[in-house]
Amino acid sequence: MGFWGLEVKPGKPQAYNPKNEQGKIHVTQATLGTGLSKEKSVIQCSIGDKAPIALCSLLPNKIECCPLNLEFDDDDEPVEFTVTGDRSIHLSGFLEYYQDDEDDYEHDEDDSDGIDVGESEEDDSCEYDSEEDEQLDEFEDFLDSNLERYRNAAAPKSGVIIEEIEDEEKPAKDNKAKQTKKKSQASEGENAKKQIVAIEGAHVPVLESEDEDEDGLPIPKGKSSEVENASGEKMVVDNDEQGSNKKRKAKAAEQDDGQESANKSKKKKNQKEKKKGENVLNEEAGQVQTGNVLKKQDISQISSNTKAQDGTANNAMSESSKTPDKSAEKKTKNKKKKKPSDEAAEISGTVEKQTPADSKSSQVRTYPNGLIVEELSMGKPNGKRADPGKTVSVRYIGKLQKNGKIFDSNIGKSPFKFRLGIGSVIKGWDVGVNGMRVGDKRKLTIPPSMGYGVKGAGGQIPPNSWLTFDVELINVQ
């Protein structure tokens, strides 16, 4: 898209052939030229052998510019512009290139697929089919190898590391022998054993119960977490999409003897069961005597949020951390009564409460001059977009921010049409409507500098008034 302009002088017809241009011409405005005459000037347009048609009439010091909506493409006949009067008239608009749109579309299509689907015309059908099959195979391999990354991106930020280790996953070259050994041992039943051991990191104590995992951390449905024990083993707790909560153990690269590690895990588990209920919080170290704390650094943020919930287990933990000697016995009784499902509901509830606040802040944009654009609802992602130079149709309700009085509205009427970005409406609308898609709804808070300024409008809008508009985009042309 590029700028286009033309000056038509009195008595000098200006010919224009759309076929000589590289794209479609959009004429958006006519402006009166400089001069001393105070008489009106009229610009006319004639296509081919047809009679001239008057486009607009401009009067000095009163009406010196006029918005237009004219389009000329390579299918049109030659056009001739003429001016009657003593002053010239300037036509302006923009050129919409043909080839660039096609190139952009093909480029976007290639990027979205992640595969080169183009083939040269010289390739025969057999070569094309084989190449396409290879690309599909590569694409499937790509999806399989990046399953972990996709699931991490889709899961909400809950302070828990998400990782899935599948038996079918290809091992790295350096650890190929060790991974093969791990699979053979896992087939003997070792992957059925479950153990979670928390390690150093945050200063948050962890509750335990008979029905919980060994560190007392409930595992939300659809999540998986990774922890590490003192012997160097990595434990991965994976919950599949069907909620089976299957747990599988992955050994570290340097661990060669998996059977010996499993025996150590059993021994450590038995010792933990004997010591259950006897753990006392260490205030100086900020952790339980067994050293059990969550590894994730931002777990402190989750703990601080869950403290605000009345009756939750984390609230009991906060109180016990202040008086460890008096509340250690009470804490042991409470954690036996608590079920993993209750604690999972508490943690997931905390995450759900955080999400609306974050999303709300991301839907409000505040500009330095005071303009506020708030997204109320979204239309279709592939809907037409409102960009400068395009004609948009909107429904709106205009109010005074001071008292909420409605001064203008077209609800129940035909949508209001205007060309975006050419100054035909107040600046707050040109900026606030830009970027909307069909079906989007926004609330615009417009300062006087981008509204009607110190003059006001029509007696209904006082000077220096802040305005609010509820705007819905109906159509884009």
UniProtKB/Swiss-Prot annotation:
Residues 389-477 form the PPIase FKBP-type domain. InterPro entries: NPL, PPIase_dom_sf, PPIase_FKBP_dom, PPIase_Fpr3/Fpr4-like. Residues 322-331 have a biased composition (Basic and acidic residues). Keywords: Chaperone, Isomerase, Nucleus, Rotamase. Residues 299-321, 351-366 have a biased composition (Polar residues). Residues 264-274 have a biased composition (Basic residues). It catalyses: [protein]-peptidylproline (omega=180) = [protein]-peptidylproline (omega=0). Its EC number is 5.2.1.8. It comes from the Eukaryota. Residues 104-135, 153-366 are annotated as: Disordered. It is found in: Nucleus. GO terms for molecular function: histone binding; peptidyl-prolyl cis-trans isomerase activity. The keyword Cell division does not apply. The keyword Metal-binding does not apply. Pfam families: FKBP_C (PF00254), NPL (PF17800). GO terms for biological process: nucleosome assembly. Broadly expressed in leaves, flowers, stems and roots. Detected in root apical meristem region and pollen. GO terms for cellular component: nucleolus; nucleus. Interacts with histone H3. PPIases accelerate the folding of proteins. It catalyzes the cis-trans isomerization of proline imidic peptide bonds in oligopeptides. Histone chaperone possibly involved in H3/H4 deposition to the nucleosome. Associates with 18S rDNA chromatin and negatively regulates the level of its expression. Belongs to the FKBP-type PPIase family. This is Peptidyl-prolyl cis-trans isomerase FKBP53.
